[in-house]
Amino acid sequence: YILENTQTHERTSVKQLAKQVGEEYVVPSVIRLWADADLLEREVFDFLGIKFLGHPDMRRLFMRNDFTGYPLRKDFDMSPEANRFPMTDEPETDWTSEWNLDDEGRLVETRHRLFDEDDFVINFGPNHPSTHGVLRLQTVVDGETIKHVYPHLGYIHRGMEKMMESMTYPQTLALTDRLNYLCAMHHRHALVGVIEEAMGVELT
């Protein structure tokens, strides 16, 4: 985690080593300290398979619910044979998963319902002109009041992080342009800024 003081702009990083429990890897969730960690921890789980203990919604965020494996792990099978595009509808679930360790150190799952019986749910997207991109939001409303929003991301995710591992820096620039057609230059500028900072390059 990278934490920043919004007044002084001081930054500090907090690193946590994942603990292995059987064949799974776990770290404590910080969602109760910082609510912004919600989607970030789900993204780590989706791509790397690390379960965040105490997070109330450890579902996939970018990949399909029936996707097998964790694509940013070094041992992930990248062969086309193991990653055929499914031709079936994506299975839906009305439950979330929360993982914790019991008194004997075993990983146990607790399930929570997404919606109450009297909830009114509006599916916003995945194709809607106001989103300016492919995005689905399961929106729980009470009259004109939005009670909760469950985002479904990744409809145009291409695994660019994995592709960039075998590219030179100049080769990656064309990929960042395709992240979002509305702000292609912003993504390229962000990547170039990180590369320059890592190389110690000062612009004049």
Protein language model regions, located:
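Active-site- and interface-proximal helix/loop "cap" or "latch" segments in soluble metabolic
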Residues: 124-204
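Conserved helix-adjacent loop modules within structured domains
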Residues: 1-119, 125-130, 134
